[in-house]
Regions:
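Asp-box/BNR beta-propeller loop motif
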Residues: 22-35, 65-77, 81-82, 117-136, ...
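Surface-exposed loop and turn segments in beta-propeller and other repeat-based domains
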Residues: 29-37, 79-83, 132-159, 197-225, ...
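Beta-strand-rich domains and repeat architectures in extracellular enzymes and scaffolds
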Residues: 32-65
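Conserved beta-propeller blade signature
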Residues: 55-57, 100, 174-177, 185, ...
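Short, compositionally biased serine/threonine- and acidic-rich segments at solvent-exposed termini, linkers
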Residues: 311, 368, 379-421
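Glycine-centered coil/turn sites that cap beta-strands in beta-rich domains
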Residues: 416-458, 510-512
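C-terminal tail/sorting-segment detector
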Residues: 499-523
Length: 523
C-alpha cells in the first residue's frame, strides 16, 4: 500500500533547494530591531500573500520574508522563541490586519527524515508584533472530542512529526489548519485552544449532522485509519469549509458552531482526477463561482494528476491540464493562473492554456533556472498591476504578461568590503540536481563591476586544462551580476566529478582584471 507521507516531499524539496541556494557566507545585515535582517530568507518560495496597502509576504524554505514596497526591498525574520517558528514556512494566510504562518523542519527518525511541525505564529498588526503558537498536540488521554452533542473518538496526535501545518484559512471567527497527521483543526481564540474536526471515513461519502460517528478519526493508513483524515489543504469562507485530503475533496457546510455537514468527492464517486488534493482555490467572477483543486494520483491505478474544477458547488466536476502536477492557483477576474511542475499556465476560459517561458530578467541578466512554479499572485495595488511568481530558484514579477520580468534572489554581496569578490553557488554543484532547466543544471559565478565592462568566464579542471570558455558578455552598468555554467565542457559533454577553477576576466577602459574561485562538481 502506498504511504501518503512521501508525496509531501515534492513541496519540501523546496527547502532542500534552499540548502544549496540561500546559504550565507557572512553575517546578514541586521535591521534596527535585531529581529529581522535585510534580504530574502531563501530563494525557494512556496507561497506569496498580499496584505494591506503594500505588504507582500513570502514563504520560503529559509523562513519568512516581507516586502513593504512592492519588491523594492525585502526583510526576513529570524526564528525567535515566542515569536517566529524555526525552519521553512509551510503556509501563510492573511485577513485584514491579521496574518498567520506555520513552520516546518526535518526530523531524523528510524525510517529517515520526516517533515515536522515547527508551530505557528500570528500577528494582529500587519506583522509588527508576533505571537508564537506551539504545534497543536493532544494529550495521550484525549481520545474523545465533543462534537454535535456527541463524544467522537479521535486518535490522539502526541508528536509534531508528520504533524505539519500545510495550509491555513482564516474567517472572521476561526483559523482553520490542515496538518496532515494532525488532521483538520480550528481555533477561535488565536491558538489558545484547538478543536479537532471529524471528517468522513474513506468508505463514507457523507457525514451528516446528528449522525452517530461510529469510527475513530485516525490518520494512520487503512485498515487502522483513514486517508481522508490526513489533511493537506483547507479553504473556509462564510459557512463553507473545503478540505483536501489524501482521499478526496470534502465540502463542509457549518450548520452550527458544533457541527459541519460533509460531502466527500473522490475519484471513485466523481470526475476528479485523483484523491490526493494538494491545493484548492475559489474563483468568483461576474456572478459565477468556480472551485479549483490540484488533484494527484493516490492509490487507484485509474487516478491521474490534473486540475479538477467545479462550477456548481461540487455537484459536477471536470478536469483540465491532464498530466500536470499542480501546486497553486491565482486569479485576475476571469483569468486563471495554475502553478505547476512544468511552469505557469494561463487561461481566459479555464479550458485552453498557454505556458509561460521561464522568467528572464534582461536588466539584471538573470534567469530563474526552474520549471517548477510553486505560487503566484496578481497584485493590483501597484499600478498597472503585477503578476508575481515563486519558484525553487527565486521570485519574479511582470507587468506585461511575461514579456519583461524583474527577478529577486538572495545571495551574498560581492561589492561589500570583506565579502568575496567572486564566488560560485551552489557549491558543491550537482549538474543533475541543482537549478534544472531544459535538462541541464546550472551554477552561478557571481561578481560585480564598477561600470561598463566586458566579462568572460572560463572553467579549468584540477590539472588546469581548459574545459569551458564562454562568450564575452557586454555589461552596460555598474552592479552585481552572475555568469551561469551548466556543467558541460565546450563539446557539450557533462564534466566529471572533481575540483574546478573558475576564471572571470573583466575588461573595462582598456584595463583587464582577472578573478578566480574554486568549484566542486558532484553528480
Amino acid at each position: 500500500m502506498k504511504k501518503f507521507i512521501y508525496p509531501i516531499l515534492s513541496l519540501l524539496l523546496v527547502a532542500s533547494a534552499l540548502n544549496a541556494q540561500a546559504f550565507r557566507l557572512s553575517k546578514p545585515s541586521l535591521t534596527a530591531d535585531n529581529r529581522t535582517y535585510s534580504g530574502l530568507a531563501g530563494n525557494a518560495a512556496t507561497q506569496i500573500e498580499a496584505q494591506g496597502d503594500s505588504i507582500l509576504w513570502f514563504a520560503t524554505g529559509g523562513g519568512l520574508s516581507r516586502s513593504s514596497d512592492f519588491g523594492q526591498s525585502f526583510v526576513s525574520y529570524y526564528p525567535i522563541p515566542d515569536s517566529i517558528p524555526k525552519g521553512g514556512i509551510s503556509s501563510i494566510a492573511a485577513l485584514d490586519s491579521i496574518i498567520w504562518i506555520a513552520g516546518v523542519f526535518d526530523s531524523t527518525t528510524k525510517i529517515g527524515s520526516i517533515q515536522t511541525g515547527a508551530g505557528l505564529a500570528f500577528s494582529k498588526d500587519f506583522g509588527r508584533n508576533w505571537t508564537y503558537v506551539k504545534q497543536p498536540l493532544d494529550s495521550a488521554s484525549a481520545t474523545y472530542e465533543k462534537w454535535d452533542g456527541d463524544n467522537v473518538k479521535f486518535l490522539p496526535v502526541v508528536t509534531p512529526v508528520s504533524n505539519t501545518t500545510w495550509d491555513i484559512s482564516l474567517t472572521p471567527k476561526y483559523v482553520y489548519i490542515a496538518s496532515w497527521a494532525g488532521g483538520i483543526r480550528r481555533s477561535s481564540d488565536f491558538g489558545a485552544s484547538w478543536q479537532r474536526i471529524p471528517l468522513p471515513s474513506d468508505d463514507d461519502d457523507v457525514l451528516e449532522c446528528g449522525e452517530k460517528i461510529t469510527f475513530q478519526i485516525n490518520p494512520n493508513d487503512p485498515p487502522k485509519g483513514n486517508h481522508n483524515h490526513k489533511g493537506f489543504s483547507v479553504l473556509a469562507y462564510g459557512d463553507t469549509v473545503w478540505v483536501g485530503t489524501a482521499n478526496g475533496i470534502n465540502l463542509g457546510i457549518a450548520e452550527s458552531d458544533s457541527c459541519i455537514r460533509w460531502r466527500k468527492y473522490d475519484a471513485q464517486n466523481s470526475a476528479i482526477s485523483g484523491n490526493f488534493v494538494v491545493a484548492m482555490a475559489r474563483q468568483v467572477w461576474n456572478g459565477k463561482e468556480t472551485f479549483w483543486a490540484a488533484t494527484l494520483s493516490a492509490e487507484s491505478s485509474s487516478e491521474y494528476q490534473a486540475i479538477s474544477k467545479s462550477s456548481d458547488g461540487g455537484l459536477t466536476w471536470s478536469t483540465t491540464l491532464s498530466g500536470e502536477r499542480g501546486y497553486n492557483f491565482a486569479f485576475d477576474d476571469s483569468i486563471v493562473y495554475v502553478c505547476t511542475e512544468s511552469g505557469l499556465f494561463k487561461s481566459i476560459d479555464g479550458e485552453n492554456w498557454a505556458l509561460y517561458d521561464p522568467a528572464e530578467d534582461s536588466v539584471r541578466r538573470e534567469t530563474l533556472y526552474s520549471h517548477n512554479v510553486y505560487t503566484a499572485v496578481v497584485d493590483q495595488r501597484e499600478f498597472p498591476g503585477y503578476l508575481w511568481i515563486g519558484t525553487a530558484d527565486g521570485i519574479a514579477k511582470t507587468r506585461d504578461d511575461g514579456i519583461h520580468w524583474s527577478i529577486y534572489r538572495q545571495s551574498v554581496s560581492t561589492k561589500t568590503k570583506g565579502d568575496p569578490q567572486i564566488y560560485a553557488f551552489p557549491n558543491p554543484f550537482s549538474p543533475t540536481h541543482h537549478n534544472i532547466l531544459n535538462g541541464d543544471g546550472h551554477v552561478r559565478i557571481k561578481y560585480h563591476v564598477d561600470g561598463a565592462a566586458q566579462v568572460q568566464l572560463e572553467i579549468y579542471d584540477f590539472a588546469m586544462r581548459a574545459v569551458y570558455k564562454g562568450d564575452k558578455q557586454s555589461i552596460t552598468a555598474a552592479g552585481e551580476y552572475a555568469e551561469p555554467w551548466n556543467g558541460r565542457n565546450s563539446d557539450g559533454t557533462q564534466v566529471a566529478n572533481g575540483t574546478y577553477f573558475c576564471k572571470l576576466t573583466q575588461e573595462s577602459r582598456g584595463k583587464e582584471k582577472t578573478y578566480w574561485t574554486k568549484l566542486i562538481v558532484v553528480k
